[in-house]
Amino acid sequence: MAKITAQLVKELRERTGAGVMDAKKALVEVDGDMDKAVQYLRDKGMAKAAKKADRVAAEGLTGVYVDGNVAAITEVNSETDFVSSNDKFVNLVNAATKTIAEGKPANMEAAEELKMADGTTLAQSFVDATATIGEKIVLRRFALEEKTDDQEFGAYQHNGGQIGVITVLEGADAATAKHLAMHIAAMSPKVISPEELDDDFITDQLAVMNHKIDQDNESRALVNKKPLPYLVYGSEKQLSDEILAKAKEDIKAELKEEGKPEKIWDKIIPGKMQRFIDDNTQVDKQFAVLSQNYIMDDSKTVGEFLKEKGAKLVAFQRYEVGEGIEKKQEDFAAEVREQMK
């Protein structure tokens, strides 16, 4: 039987990331054959990963990697936020994001077949990480953006990688592209312009906003405050020429009733019309980045800011760890009872 030396154990640990006892046991099982020991640990890791497959992994990190005219963004999930500060986990996120940027896979299946720097497939790297770290580790999603030489990438990660953003801008410098990425990280838009918002989505969001107004009005009634009006429209897509014309006529009628001289109406109407538009484009302001007030200068919208710069937002990607995943609610008392059986 081969002698299992400390050097052999160290080498196997460096190749696989396994713990000391697991590495030593693997070498004993295969009589000191390094390649067989690596495979033994991988097989063991796949078994561990299979046992963890039904666990909810909703924590983790985003990864952002930019190289020349290609940028990649990923979300890698773990079961607990404690793991997100683990060096092995962080290194895996960075390496996987770089591999995806370089390989430019068309879908998740193609991404999983990409080879990492050590020759391991991306899929196997996540199996190995699950075994080594002891939690379910998964690549949940990724996106690629490409630009031309005269365009600019902006990249930003917030809160230690909990949010990641990539922007592609035309006619802008790197600083503007990054500042817009920071805006998107903070304001969570879903689309670039209101035209991209689905009609059913607008209707649903209006219902949500009016429900909130209902709740606010209940509170206002308790202190004898005037109730807030309900929103009729939510997007500029809904504000047809006819609707805007009627709003203008309503404003004129209001000014006439208030006794305002007709000669000053032209000075008052534009401001009131803008207020009408602002009040009736709340869905745009929440979800379309060009309609949002720019966080670096809230006196103007992002669209107005970019127009002043002669710039155009071509594309963006925003990932937030765990968004859309239903997290498991832990019952620690039940868990302890189960362990005591």
Curated annotation (Swiss-Prot):
Protein family: Belongs to the EF-Ts family.
Location of the protein in the cell: Cytoplasm
GO cellular component: cytoplasm
Protein name: Elongation factor Ts
Annotated keywords: Cytoplasm, Elongation factor, Protein biosynthesis
Gene Ontology terms for molecular function: translation elongation factor activity
Upper classification of the organism: Bacteria, Bacillati, Bacillota, Bacilli, Lactobacillales
Transmembrane residue ranges: none
Function: Associates with the EF-Tu.GDP complex and induces the exchange of GDP to GTP. It remains bound to the aminoacyl-tRNA.EF-Tu.GTP complex up to the GTP hydrolysis stage on the ribosome.
Region (Involved in Mg(2+) ion dislocation from EF-Tu): 80-83
UniProt main location, coarse: cytoplasm
UniProt cross-references to PROSITE patterns, sorted A to Z: EF_TS_1, EF_TS_2
InterPro entries xref list: EF-Ts_dimer_sf, Transl_elong_EFTs/EF1B, Transl_elong_EFTs/EF1B_dimer, Transl_elong_Ts_CS, UBA-like_sf
